[in-house]
Structures are given as C-alpha cells and as structure tokens.
Amino acid sequence: MHTDDRSWITLRQDADTGIETIRAHFEGHAFDPHWHDSYLIGFTEQGVQQFSCRGALHKSTPGQIFLVEPGEIHDGDAPVDGGFTYSMLYLEPAWLARELRTLDDTPLACGEPGFDRTLTERPQLLSAIANAFHALEQCDLRIVRQTALDTLLLNLSGHLRWRQERQDDPRLPRVAIRAREYLHAHFDQDIGLDELAAVTGVSRFRLSRAFKAAFGLAPHAYLIQLRLARARYLLARGQAPAEVASILGFADQSHLGRWFRRAYGLTPAHYRTRCSNLPDD
C-alpha cells in the first residue's frame, strides 16, 4: 500500500463501453499482489515501473507497453527515486472479444484473446493506446472515442493470440483446484483453513503449500482478491462501500477500505464516485 503524499491516481469510466481509464503516479511501494477481471493495457510515461507477473520481475520504462490478462497476479513498486507515472485502460473481456470479432468479415476462431508478452515496445500500438486513453479520459465526442478504440483494436489484434477458453493445468494438484473451486463458490462466507482442509481431504499445511505453489497466493490472500474483484463490480454500479463490505463478508467498511487501497491505490468511495457519478458517501 502506498503512503507517500506524492502519489496520486485519477480514474474515469466510459459510460458506453465500461472501459476504465486510470492515470497514476506512485513513489515507493505502489500496490500489493492482486489481479483484475479485465485486460490491462497501458504504458509507462515516466520513471521505472517494477512489477512481478507470470513468475518474472519486469521493469517498464517510458515508452514501454505492459499487457496483463484477467486473473494474472501482479504488484507494483517504484525502485528508483522520482517514482513512476503510467496510463492504463481496463478492457472488459466480453467487450474486447466481441469487438475483435467485428474487425474482419471472417469470424475469428472460438476462444479468448491473450497476450504473448507482458512488456513490449511497439510505437504504433503505443500511439493507439495513448490516443484511445485521451479520447476516453477527456470524454470526447462519441465518434472520436469510437474511432480511437477501433484504431486501438486494429493495432492490438496483431499482438494477440487466440486460445481455447482456459482449462486447468493438468499438472496442478487436485487439492489446490478443489480448494479454489470452493473459495469461488463461497467467497462471501467466513471460510477457515480447517473447512478447506476438510473439503479437500488433506491437512491445512499441505493444502496451504499446494495452493500457493499452484496459484501464487495463499488461500486467505486468494479469498480477499475474489472479494475485492466483486467489490469493484458492485461499487462501479453505485452500491455504497458499507453495503458492499457487508455483502462480501468484510468486518466493516474500514476493513474493506484497507484491502481495497492496498490492491488498487484508492479508496472504495473514490472508486465508486469516479465510476458511477454518484456523490461520495
């Protein structure tokens, strides 16, 4: 969680597409490991942006593009003085897949889009991302926003691979997969390790080791990320932070706020206000 007063973040959500635009500056530690349900497409404007993703440590510098798929765990730090500034688009998976399929007369293969690389340097793609970002952030004319997004999609299509919808890696321990399924089905409940161990038929210690090795997070951290992803969804649709905290099993609004800020760098109330255009509670 960032605490430096020099850090800041601005956010806007496009009413037509649901795309979020985020521009932020962080000094020191930016955010804890987390994931998003969206595709993240952005670029570093200034400084060095260091983050872990796909089991590797990446350092993005000005002009570099970063591409993160839904569900990919990543964090963020500023390893040098002066911090880093970035601009980013959050693209909903259903919107991206649907729009990509309209690019050609011939339908694309079934499946979902993915990125071959987390970091890349493509001047034409960088320009397309920046133009789409500014058109959405400035709430430009609808025809301007749509043209900028079409240009982005055309440039992005050359850097995507289409794959079958994700299947579990057969090498993953069955106990880890079963525990993950249980967490997804009961993420709003007060789940204990004993309960997960009983469901999977192994000890708490074996389960915790297998789960973290498989998914990169301990069971409790994974559960929190599930709740935070749902919290973003509910807040963006106007539900009050206190209500969201209660629905998702957080102890109270401040408990939700602490975890939300550690993952995303802003408060639930700020996120709700920027996405829903409702007054801050």
Task: Name each model feature, range by range.
Residues 75-79, 159-160, 212:
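Sigma70-family region 2
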Residues 2-109:
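N-terminal regulatory/effector-sensing and dimerization cores
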Residues 102-165, 181:
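Amphipathic alpha-helical segments enriched in hydrophobic/aromatic residues interleaved with Lys/Arg
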Residues 155, 178, 184, 190-226, ...:
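Basic/polar phosphate-binding segments, predominantly the helix-turn-helix DNA-binding elements
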Residues 118-132, 146, 164-200, 222-240, ...:
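A short, Lys/Arg-enriched amphipathic alpha-helix from helix-turn-helix/homeodomain DNA-binding modules
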